[in-house]
Curated annotation (Swiss-Prot):
PROSITE patterns: VELVET. One of its GO terms (biological process) is sporulation resulting in formation of a cellular spore. This is Developmental and secondary metabolism regulator VEL1. Residues 291-310, 341-351, 379-389, 458-475 have a biased composition (Pro residues). Component of the heterotrimeric velvet complex composed of LAE1, VEL1 and VEL2; VEL1 acting as a bridging protein between LAE1 and VEL2. Interacts with LAE1. It comes from Hypocrea jecorina (strain QM6a) (Trichoderma reesei). It is found in: Nucleus; Cytoplasm. It holds the Pfam family Velvet. Residues 222-520 are annotated as: Disordered. InterPro entries: Velvet, Velvet_dom, Velvet_dom_sf. Residues 432-448 have a biased composition (Polar residues). It comes from the Eukaryota. Residues 26-220 form the Velvet domain. Component of the velvet transcription factor complex that controls sexual/asexual developmental ratio in response to light, promoting sexual development in the darkness while stimulating asexual sporulation under illumination. The velvet complex hat acts as a global regulator for secondary metabolite gene expression. Regulates expression of the carbohydrate-active enzyme gene clusters.
Length: 573
């Protein structure tokens, strides 16, 4: 007769239950059941036909361990689980974890217990891990209704050998068969509705260990917990998808509307080193430099009518050699160095204004010439000018068209003339700013304050100015730089030319390659084709129209539309 033993209290989550039984041969057997894995949560699967196929198993699956010990006590006995010849199975049932008070009126819902679906019975599996024992696994247990429940497992034994029967059978009238041995209960767990279910957890290490040994257990590698964002109830699938997209997709950075595209002009890199070293200018020139008008008048020419004294400067690159150079690159300027006394405004002044009496009215113009010669020494770099870029493009597209002086000098002349100097650009040795000597102001010249960021100029009123002789030529200058010059344009005035106001004609279309269009090679026949007809080849040779080639020849179409003939080699079969 099996007698229940005292339940061993344990501080862990495992619950242990033991019984003691004496067989006919006076063998003392101890049965010990341990719930190794307690159920924690489940989702109610509901009722109906859909609930039969859409199972919601208890998570994690319950696992119960059975040990059979033979001896006077559990501590002194021997484990005979693998040697004992009998069959065991464990049956699971569901019961309420809270005591329900019965009312006066008994209805059907009160009498019926909670419904447990799935596979409630489990046979014993002999496993080596985690320890050598018998295990009952319930991977397919579902609950139909939500609530607070616990599972109750009943152990049944089918005895095979007569010596292992009970010493005192429970009912002598019945033949020996399946005997109920003991019962053990799990800890209470919650069954949630579909809206409140928090989700399935990752499979435990015990479930993975059992599954590795061949038992049927569902293994989940990832955590399928629901992200609720603080919501207590309700489940919105669209909200979950939106949350997943927000969690995984990185938003693109917002663009600043105040930022503009980078300019393609590299004029600032050339203009930067010369900003603190600009020569004196007229106040009107400085004001116009700060605020240039959108469409200035045509500039005056500095090559139109120089006096005869300036010719040696053009051909010999400077007259007197007693004046030190002010800039490295402008020293080799082979054009536009007229030297004369104060003359009407239409005539340019000396090449390099460094007089101590007063700044020249055209100091800004000559200084822009100097800067332009330095800029143009680098052919790919555009000129650094505050004038509108439309004027630069208009003059650069017409490099061979000269300009004539206006009726009065303009403070924007140098700004507009710089693009036209591309025809007379200095050779490459003068393009390096590091090779240019530092600009030095003579002692007799007034001092000006020139900040690095935006220069401001203060100059006395203009006075007659006598231009000194140009500086001596650089040692590296050669006469070969005179090749692009037109002496006639330097010594003879040109007729006045009005500013061009109409847009330039569109440039001619250039061929991008030798590939012909499809229409030039193949004929376009838009008629429908029937009975195996094909498109008509207009370039097919007239000599082969509708004829079959010789047996030893083949025809092929070339890329130019002609028909080629190839002769095959003669061979014997």
């Amino acid at each position: 007769m099996a007698t229940p033993s005292s339940v061993a209290s344990s501080s862990s989550r495992d619950q242990v239950q033991r019984i003691h039984r004496v067989t006919r041969e006076n063998r003392h057997l101890w049965y010990q059941l341990t719930v190794l894995q307690q159920p924690e949560r489940a989702r109610a699967c509901g009722s109906g036909m859909k609930a039969n196929s859409d199972r919601r198993p208890v998570d994690p699956p319950p696992v119960v361990e059975l040990r059979i010990i033979e001896g006077p006590s559990v501590e002194e006995g021997k484990d005979i689980t693998f040697d004992y010849n009998a069959n065991f199975f464990l049956y699971a049932s569901l019961e309420q974890a809270r005591t329900i008070a019965h009312g006066r009126v008994q209805n059907g819902a009160t009498n019926n217990p909670p419904i447990l679906t799935g596979v409630p019975a489990s046979g014993m599996a002999y496993l080596d891990r985690p320890t050598e024992a018998g295990y009952f696994i319930f991977p397919d247990l579902s609950v139909r209704h939500e609530g607070y429940f616990r599972l109750s497992f009943s152990l049944y034994e089918t005895t095979k050998e007569p010596k292992d029967f009970d010493l005192e059978p429970a009912d002598s009238d019945l033949p020996p068969g399946v005997d109920w041995r003991m019962e053990i209960k799990t800890q209470p767990f919650n069954v949630f509705s579909a809206k409140k279910f928090p989700g399935l957890m990752e499979s435990t290490s015990l479930s993975k260990t059992v599954a590795d040994q061949g038992c049927r257990v569902r293994i989940r590698r990832d955590v399928r917990m629901r992200k609720r964002d603080g919501k207590g109830s309700g489940f919105d699938r669209r909200g979950e998808e939106e949350y997943s997209r927000r969690r995984t997709v990185t938003p693109a950075p917002a663009e600043d509307p105040n930022l503009r595209a980078r300019s393609v002009s590299n004029a600032s890199e050339h203009r930067g080193p010369y900003m603190p070293q600009e020569p004196p200018r007229r106040p009107s020139a400085a004001e116009s430099y700060h605020a240039p008008p959108p469409l200035p008048p045509p500039p005056p020419s500095s090559y139109d009518a120089p006096p005869p004294a300036a010719r040696p400067g053009h051909l010999g690159f400077g007259g007197d050699h007693n004046m030190p150079p002010q800039y490295g690159a402008p020293a080799a300027r082979p054009y536009g160095h007229p030297q004369s006394a104060p003359i009407p405004p239409a005539t340019p002044t000396g090449p390099y204004p460094t007089s101590s009496a007063a700044p020249s009215p055209y100091a800004k113009q000559d200084h822009h010439h100097q800067q332009q010669y330095s800029y143009n020494s680098r052919p790919p770099a555009p000129s650094a000018s505050p004038a509108p870029p439309m004027k630069h493009a208009m003059y650069d597209n017409r490099p061979s068209e000269p300009y004539v002086p206006h009726s009065s000098p303009s403070v924007y002349a140098s700004t507009e003339r710089r693009p036209s100097y591309a025809n007379y650009s200095a050779p490459a040795p003068y393009s390096t700013p590091a090779s240019q000597p530092t600009y030095s102001t003579p002692a007799s010249q007034p001092t000006y304050s020139t900040p690095a960021s935006q220069p401001t100029y203060s100059a006395p009123p203009p006075a007659p100015y006598s231009a000194p002789a140009p500086p001596p030529p650089r040692p590296s200058m050669s006469q070969s730089s005179l090749a692009p010059l037109k002496i006639a344009s330097l010594v003879s005035p040109l007729p006045p030319i009005e500013a061009q106001t109409e847009p330039l004609p569109p440039p001619p279309m250039l061929s991008t390659g030798g590939k012909r269009k499809h229409d030039h090679v193949f004929s376009q026949n838009h008629k429908p084709l029937y009975n195996g007809q094909r498109q008509l080849d207009a370039h097919y040779g007239h000599g082969y129209r509708g004829l079959t080639p010789e047996p030893d020849q083949g025809l092929y179409s070339r890329a130019d539309g002609q028909i080629g003939v190839v002769t095959f080699n003669q061979y014997q079969v």
